[in-house]
Regions:
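Membrane-interface interhelical linkers
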Residues: 1-13, 17-29, 33-64, 75-84, ...
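Interfacial helix-capping/hinge residues at the ends of transmembrane alpha-helices
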Residues: 14-19, 27, 77-78, 89, ...
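Structural signature of hydrophobic alpha-helical transmembrane segments
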Residues: 1-11, 55-70, 114-126, 187-198, ...
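Helix-loop-helix hairpin linking two adjacent transmembrane segments in secondary transporters
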Residues: 102-122, 171, 176-179
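Loop-to-transmembrane alpha-helix entry segments
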Residues: 56-57, 93, 110-139, 148-151, ...
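Alpha-helical transmembrane segments of compact multi-pass small-molecule transporters, enriched
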Residues: 37-42, 92-107, 122, 195, ...
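Juxtamembrane helix-start motifs in multi-pass secondary transporters
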Residues: 30-31, 89, 188
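Hydrophobic/small/kink-forming positions within alpha-helical transmembrane segments
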Residues: 12, 16, 43, 67-71, ...
């Protein structure tokens, strides 16, 4: 249980540091720097711990999963960070991801959707509908930029990437197991991050050469003293330390219990977002967050 709790906390820290990186560097550029640093750290760990665990048949599936999850999902995630903040972005992302995953498994694998699943889905959607109400801007410590509705759509796309990428990743794990090449969570994360890094690099190129000037002219150096601590936190807390704790938790507990605990991340990060961003959600938004997270917890326990 300690590992699951640590996973929740590290994912929460990853969110608030990632949001600051998105604001300081810009969503596309900041995400590329974060994934680049994470890829270097994960690559070193894989070379030391599991150098023989990467096989081409499973790599293809992990790479596809990474394109969807770390690629499309994280580009959208950082786009949302700089528009609606970390609290609402993570709430939409983590609460909607299981719904997208269930729909894909239903269409692709033929898994049924029972009445309990439908009830949980309705709870999640009702909570999200209440939670998207903007909080007070007068006490914000970090100035958001961009249109609010664009951030909402981006967070929903991030949830799609997260959920769909997770389903494809499970397929990759099954292929790796058949090959006898099942490595650690770090090995899987490295293969997925590589794909996300490629997708993010393409996104940066498109923004730089085809986007409006205001979207890239404010990009700062990742070596800026004010940026480095936040960038290190965003790169390490999530893809490296958070994933490692997540795999540790799965070794000790049933996956449903682990996912139920991790689903509390949007609640755990409320005080963090308040401290780092000055985020003060409305009472309705708080109630909505609790309802949505409760739906996800029940879904993971019942599914």
């Amino acid at each position: 249980m300690i590992a699951a709790i640590l996973t929740t906390l590290f994912f929460a820290f990853s969110a608030v540091t990632g949001q600051r990186v998105a604001v300081m560097l810009g969503g596309a550029w900041g995400n590329l720097m974060r994934l680049g640093l994470a890829a270097v750290v994960l690559g070193i760990l894989v070379a030391i711990l599991t150098p023989d665990a990467i096989r081409w048949p499973s790599f293809q599936w992990f790479f596809l999963s990474g394109l969807i999850g770390f690629g499309l999902g994280d580009v959208a995630l950082f786009t949302a960070y700089e528009r609606i903040g970390s609290r609402l972005t993570i709430l939409l992302n983590l609460c909607l991801a299981p719904l997208f995953a269930m729909v894909l498994e239903w269409l692709w694998l033929g898994n049924g959707l029972g009445p309990r699943v439908v009830v949980c889905a309705l709870l999640i959607l009702a909570g999200v509908a209440m939670a998207i109400r903007p909080g007070s801007k007068s006490r914000a410590k970090v100035a958001l930029r961009g249109r609010y509705w664009v951030g909402i759509v981006a967070a929903i796309i991030a949830g799609f990437g997260q959920g769909t990428g997770a389903v494809v990743s499970r397929k990759a794990e099954a292929v790796a197991l058949e090959l006898g090449a099942s490595g650690s969570g770090i090995t899987a994360a490295f293969q997925r991050v590589l794909a996300g890094l490629l997708f993010s690099a393409i996104a940066v190129i498109l923004v730089r050469f085809f986007g409006s000037r205001k979207n890239w002219e404010s990009w700062r150096s990742p070596l800026d003293r004010k940026v480095v601590p936040w960038l290190l936190g965003a790169a390490l807390f999530g893809p490296v330390i958070g994933v490692s704790c997540f795999q540790w938790a799965l070794q000790d507990l049933e996956s449903g219990i682990v996912l139920a605990v991790v689903a509390l991340t949007p609640i755990a990060m409320l005080p963090l977002a308040r401290i780092t961003e000055g985020d003060h959600p409305s009472r309705l938004a708080l109630v909505g967050a609790v309802v949505a997270v409760a739906g996800v917890v029940l879904l993971n326990l019942w599914a």
